Amino acid sequence: MKLSDFIQALPKTETHLHVEGALPYELLQAWKPEEYPPNPAFRQPDYRYATFPDFDSILLSHALPWFTNAERYYEASKAIFAKHVAQNVRYVETSFHLAVTKFIRLPGPEIIAAIRAAVPAGLEVRIFTGMLRSDIVGDLRPTIDQLHTWDGLAGVDLHGFEAMRTEPETAAIWARLRAAGKITKCHAGEFGGADRVREAIEQLGVDRIQHGVRAIEDPAVVRLAAERGVTFDMCPISNLRLQVVPSLREHPIRRFMAAGVRCTVSTDDPLNFANTVNDEYHVLASELDFTRAELSQVARNGWAVADVPVAMKRAVSGEIDQLLNGSTPA
């Protein structure tokens, strides 16, 4: 079996995906072809974002004109999830930006319902909301205080510009949300150093770090993540394009896994990077020399943290075993 066929056949997950940042560019082109030309420079593989604000500006200038109502969330999500199904991705965790509820005056539960309505048969989707660190003390605080009541909300994520300080109240809010059955995540170790990863683990109590790349700068933080059973939901292509790493060969995912840190791979914001989940697996093989067994372990890691029944996890594990043994799963 060719490597490309093996990667396609792997039952995969995506656990780090921003729905606004996953807006399919072809939807924008079909909507306003005069404004969105084919193959813009920022979507080319050799394009590098100079700064996070540079990246954020491009994302917002493309996503905000589109996401103006629930129907647009449905339409985008339907196209996003179709791409997952085509790649044999069977479980997805995706987040919408909480501030959108204020920007377009659309209640969060309506966004959740729109995304949920777009989920096709055979795909498990868990919906999160993400917020800036500063939102904890801003106008969104009343909304944040009600998140535990939102049906269909799997969890929350702290994202955006990592240089912002983490507000002291965040730890208590995250703890309350966990007590209400919500999964808590935090972006850390992307543009901030290993200390931000330690902060997220020790102070916020999360066991899901989005990125985590720069934890490699402090072996003690790597050990902490391994000892606490923390998962790093990593995005190698995003890290390259945003210059978090100088090259894919220097990406630390292999070193993290060798140290006992569970790592997954996802696309982050494919609107900006023009990447797919399969692409992420291919670069692990081509740039970091991952074997098929190691690629399979990455897939297993995604299922280990997936919010699905144990029986489904066992079935998928058996399917991966069959692939590694050279037989075609039934």
Curated annotation (Swiss-Prot):
EC nos: 3.5.4.-
GO MF terms, alphabetically ordered: adenine deaminase activity; metal ion binding
UniProt cofactor(s): Zn(2+)
The UniProt record lists the keyword Oxidoreductase: no
Keywords carried by this UniProt record: Hydrolase, Metal-binding, Nucleotide metabolism, Zinc
Cofactor binding mode and count: Binds 1 zinc ion per subunit.
Coiled coil: none
Active-site feature positions: 190 (proton donor)
Binding locations of Zn(2+): 16, 18, 187, 268
Source taxon at top rank: Bacteria
CC per GO annotation: cytosol
Residues reported to bind substrate: 18, 20, 160, 269
GO biological process entries: adenine catabolic process; hypoxanthine salvage; nucleotide metabolic process
Site features described as Important for catalytic activity, chain residue numbers: 211
PANTHER family named in the record: ADENINE DEAMINASE
Family: Belongs to the metallo-dependent hydrolases superfamily. Adenosine and AMP deaminases family.
Function: Putative nucleoside deaminase. May catalyze the hydrolytic deamination of adenosine or some similar substrate and play a role in purine metabolism.
Name under which the protein is recorded: Putative adenosine/adenine deaminase
Organism name: Opitutus terrae (strain DSM 11246 / JCM 15787 / PB90-1)
Taxonomic placement: Bacteria, Pseudomonadati, Verrucomicrobiota, Opitutia, Opitutales
